[in-house]
Amino acid sequence: MSKNKPQKSLNTGKIQIIHGMHAVRAALLNTKRAHLELHITENNHEFAKNYKSAIKKITILDQKEFKKLYGGEKSTQGIVLKTNDFERPSLQQFVKNENVNDKSVLLALDQITDPQNIGSIMRSCALFNCKGIILAKDNAPDLTPSLYKAASGAAEIVNYFRVTNLKRSISELKKYGYWAYGFDSSEDSKSSNINFTKKSILVFGSEGKGMRDLVKKECDEIIQINMHQNKHYQIDSLNVSNAATIALYEFFKS
């Protein structure tokens, strides 16, 4: 391990910066990546020792150097990895390679742009065996350091499909046997007691606006998650990541 002061590195091209213990650990375990450099604070020496075989260069920084480069340890936990991204399948490639008889669930997120929410949803996807997240690429965030950290390693295994047209992608998936369930709190929604099909798309809109009408019309069923609403304090809706987790659990146990 070297203690030479490194140059500040940024995400360029296929080079990615990942920080946080869980996100970095998962990336280091991903054999599809080619890792370039690990920057750690002195108190993370033991963490680095466990992954010496996976990384070309490990640089130990004192607190002052690390803070100058990365702004302190609060968000990074004193662990920053510079790594090459790996090739991810397109939605079309995924569907064509999928076994038609396999049980499969995908999430479609309409105009959900917050990396923290998407990272949290991705983590739930990993835990409930969801195959991937679909978003329109014109408003979907890149795989940023904050998204990787929020996903706690799940970004290494959950597909991230950025498509040109979300409505069209849902329509195309239905040709492969998928059934689209839109989750919405409107009065015309059905209760959440449903029988999922073997291949399902769970569709969610943004917390403020919900699904756009054109996406909603593409759904085969509109579902409402049953819950107690506190009208007095105006607590009447779930965070989208929580709603997605509930929906994934319902599919998982079906």
Task: Give each language-model segment a name.
Residues 47, 140-146, 209-218:
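Short, glycine/polar-rich helix-capping loops at beta-to-alpha or helix-loop-helix junctions
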Residues 181-237:
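Active-site/ligand-binding-proximal alpha/beta "capping" segment
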Residues 1-99:
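N-terminal positively charged helical leader segments and presequences
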Residues 92, 96-187:
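RNA substrate-binding interface of SAM-dependent RNA methyltransferases
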